[in-house]
């Protein structure tokens, strides 16, 4: 996907970390600024990532914006805004995720699946979406970024019959709907993890409370002023 004919770009240095500008197309002269915003966010979130992992996150952002029109990946086109609202927003859940194999349903452009796969190369990640074009993008970017732990699948959740230790989603407006479609894909001792703006409502707790144990984690996403929560649900009677 990269365009090697583009003019040379300014390199980005973060302390003793150097981000090689080779291969970047859309980020251009903003690369140093974006690299520093990312590094500061990683530090604030308490995540340990190598220089290569940080570069890979920025390459993903670059390709997301480059191929956005062709694949209809995101409504956000400004690189700084996309970095904060997509990449850093997903980074905020990394330290809170239970261990084990992971399925991300309704993954869209691969959020949070690709971000998790970059940060946790030891974890097996499956990105599931019924949109063929978006899965083609994830397949291509996973190959280019060397994400051997990523498996993109174009399918509806109802037709996917594998069980996972962790099932995530960033796409569902309703927590109840997410639980309904995700539960059949969850291993017995597994966890459902929903990225949400607000904490669970009283109605959601009432409907789900008999069968599910709730853990609500308030997320502090660097540079994002919107309310963000990770809702973790596990079976009460296992």
From Swiss-Prot:
The keyword rRNA processing applies. It is an enzyme of class 2 (transferase). GO terms for molecular function: rRNA (guanine-N7-)-methyltransferase activity. Its EC number is 2.1.1.170. It catalyses: guanosine(527) in 16S rRNA + S-adenosyl-L-methionine = N(7)-methylguanosine(527) in 16S rRNA + S-adenosyl-L-homocysteine. InterPro entries: rRNA_ssu_MeTfrase_G (IPR003682), SAM-dependent_MTases_sf (IPR029063). SUPFAM superfamilies: S-adenosyl-L-methionine-dependent methyltransferases. It is found in: Cytoplasm. Keywords: Cytoplasm, Methyltransferase, rRNA processing, S-adenosyl-L-methionine, Transferase. GO terms for cellular component: cytosol. S-adenosyl-L-methionine binds at residues 106, 111, 157-158, 170. It comes from the Bacteria. Specifically methylates the N7 position of guanine in position 527 of 16S rRNA. PANTHER family: S-ADENOSYL-L-METHIONINE-DEPENDENT METHYLTRANSFERASES SUPERFAMILY PROTEIN. NCBIfam families: rsmG_gidB. Belongs to the methyltransferase superfamily. RNA methyltransferase RsmG family. This is Ribosomal RNA small subunit methyltransferase G. It comes from Psychrobacter arcticus (strain DSM 17307 / VKM B-2377 / 273-4).
């Amino acid at each position: 996907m990269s365009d090697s004919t583009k003019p040379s770009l300014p390199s980005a240095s973060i302390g003793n970390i150097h981000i090689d500008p080779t291969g970047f197309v859309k980020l251009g002269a903003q690369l140093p600024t974006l690299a520093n915003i990312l590094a500061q966010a990683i530090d604030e979130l308490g995540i340990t990532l190598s220089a290569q992992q940080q570069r890979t996150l920025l390459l993903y952002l670059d390709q997301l914006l480059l191929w956005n029109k062709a694949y209809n990946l995101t409504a956000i086109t400004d690189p700084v805004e996309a970095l904060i609202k997509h990449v850093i927003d997903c980074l905020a859940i990394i330290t809170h995720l239970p261990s084990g194999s992971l399925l991300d349903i309704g993954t869209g452009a691969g959020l949070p699946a690709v971000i998790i796969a970059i940060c946790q190369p030891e974890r097996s990640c499956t990105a599931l979406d019924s949109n063929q074009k978006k899965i083609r993008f994830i397949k291509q970017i996973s190959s280019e970024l060397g994400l051997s732990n990523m498996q993109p699948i174009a399918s509806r959740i109802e037709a996917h019959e594998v069980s996972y230790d962790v099932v995530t989603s960033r796409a569902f407006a309703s927590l109840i709907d997410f639980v309904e479609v995700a539960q059949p894909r969850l291993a017995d001792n597994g966890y459902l993890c929903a990225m949400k703006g607000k904490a669970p409502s009283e109605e959601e707790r009432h409907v789900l409370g008999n069968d599910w144990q709730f853990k609500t984690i308030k997320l502090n996403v660097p540079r994002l002023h919107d309310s963000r929560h990770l809702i973790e649900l596990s079976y009460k009677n296992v």
